[in-house]
């Protein structure tokens, strides 16, 4: 059986995802589709709008098998996110991967990926020089890549899907994976569009309009039914209390000493000394109920996750990195946790249909890592994912007053 891999978040599943799925099957001639999906936290450094099991119901729209991208990869840079997804696809024996891109040109994307792989030291050194002089990371990368290639090629890295596409290709090149890449030109609105402009609305715009009457036009029928029957939507600022509690815990463990606090939070990816210092001041302000200047919520003047991220971001460390850093702090996922999957890889199954079940049986004897459908025997291995799910479920329960069943109770979705 030939499997095509899709790296997804389905946050929520919409017309563009269905187009991507159908086009992937058509281009690759695959027998089944395998979606590697972020769990309850997503790459932009936010809570998913619905829990991972509900989002795994993309199975009703034609996906055959959904497996979880471990949380340490799900809330990391584009490079680590892509590397983690390709590891999972390699372990699950995917023959190909199909990803969206603004370019739609696999040859140009592959050429750029090879250049970046061949010049990693130069990239790191040049970008470091630029950022040290106050240039933003994005601008520094753009200038460096332009030196190595040309203006038009470097311009591809200004688009979100192109960036991820290149990272998928880099992961394949570096690891010599036997996974054939295909790209599908993105259709409809831009990834970051907050307004709905076409039938292919962005997930960003849809999350902001989940309760609008006309949203069904932009979501496949079966996905729309699931979305309308699960209205306990979660938004980025819903993590505020959990983050606040975590920061207080770090303050307490640091005996309220600034230097010790800074040392403790610098153990997390993307937290440098300047960011750590800003976090310390903000955390101390919270204790006295003094909202950090510039960190007031637009809604009620109170401290919030989003406003704090805006407050502590710098030119060198953009907002997306700050959000991921604060989510990782909330979840307790420091730099050491990134090594965990490399040492103890696994495939965590979230759901499957009949074809997906057949594929699991097909690969079970040859797969080289644990293929997990029941977590009881793999608690230690899955600890980070379980912890992330528990925090997410506590947030849902606190907001809506409903009991959410955790990973120990819920098994894979079957359709």
Q: Which stretches of residues belong to each language-model region?
A:
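N-terminal catalytic cores of NTP/NDP-binding nucleotidyl/phosphoryl-transfer enzymes
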Residues: 1-52
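Short beta-strands and strand-loop turn motifs
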Residues: 6-7, 36-38, 67-70, 182-184
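Generic structural signal for well-ordered alpha-helices
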Residues: 21-22, 56, 86
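Short, high-confidence coil segments that cap the C-terminus of an alpha-helix
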Residues: 28-31, 63, 94
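Glycine-rich loop at the start of a catalytic domain that most often binds anionic cofactors/ligands
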Residues: 46-57, 80-83
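A glycine-rich helix N-cap at a beta->alpha junction
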Residues: 57-71
């Amino acid at each position: 059986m030939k499997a095509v891999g899709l790296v997804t978040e389905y946050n929520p599943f919409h017309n563009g995802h269905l187009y991507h799925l159908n086009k992937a099957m058509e281009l690759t001639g695959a027998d089944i589709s395998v979606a590697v999906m972020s769990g309850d936290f997503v790459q932009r450094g936010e809570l998913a709008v619905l829990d991972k099991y509900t989002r795994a119901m993309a199975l009703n729209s034609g996906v055959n098998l959904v497996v979880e991208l471990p949380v340490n990869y799900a809330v990391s840079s584009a490079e680590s996110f892509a590397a983690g997804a390709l590891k999972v696809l390699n372990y699950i024996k995917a023959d190909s991967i199909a990803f969206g891109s603004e370019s739609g040109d696999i040859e140009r994307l592959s050429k750029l990926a090879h250049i970046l792989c061949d010049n990693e030291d130069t990239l790191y050194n040049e970008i470091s020089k630029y950022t040290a002089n106050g240039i933003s990371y994005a601008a520094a990368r753009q200038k460096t890549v332009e030196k190595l290639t040309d203006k038009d090629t470097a311009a591809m890295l200004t688009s979100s899907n192109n960036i991820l596409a290149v990272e998928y290709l880099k992961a394949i090149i570096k690891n010599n994976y036997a996974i054939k890449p295909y790209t599908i030109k993105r259709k409809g609105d831009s990834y970051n569009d907050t307004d709905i402009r076409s039938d292919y609305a962005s997930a960003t715009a849809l999350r902001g309009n989940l309760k609008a009457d006309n949203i069904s036009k932009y979501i496949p029928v079966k996905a729309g039914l699931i979305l309308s029957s699960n209205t306990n939507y979660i938004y980025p600022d819903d993590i505020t209390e959990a983050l606040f509690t975590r920061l207080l815990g770090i303050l307490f463990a640091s005996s309220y000493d600034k230097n010790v606090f800074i040392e403790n939070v610098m153990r997390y990816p993307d937290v440098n000394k300047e960011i750590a210092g800003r976090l310390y001041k903000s955390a101390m302000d919270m204790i006295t109920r003094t909202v950090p200047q510039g960190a007031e919520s637009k809604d009620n003047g109170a401290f919030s996750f989003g406003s704090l991220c805006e407050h502590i971001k710098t030119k060198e460390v953009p907002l997306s990195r700050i959000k991921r850093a604060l989510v990782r702090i909330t979840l307790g996922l420091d730099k050491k946790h990134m090594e965990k999957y490399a040492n103890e890889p696994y495939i965590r199954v979230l759901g499957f249909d009949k074809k997906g079940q057949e594929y699991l049986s097909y690969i079970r004897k040859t797969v080289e890592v644990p293929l997990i459908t029941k977590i009881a025997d793999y608690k230690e291995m899955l600890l980070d994912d379980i912890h992330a799910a528990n925090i997410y479920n506590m947030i849902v329960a606190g907001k809506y007053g409903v009991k959410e069943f955790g990973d120990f109770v819920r098994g894979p979705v079957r359709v």
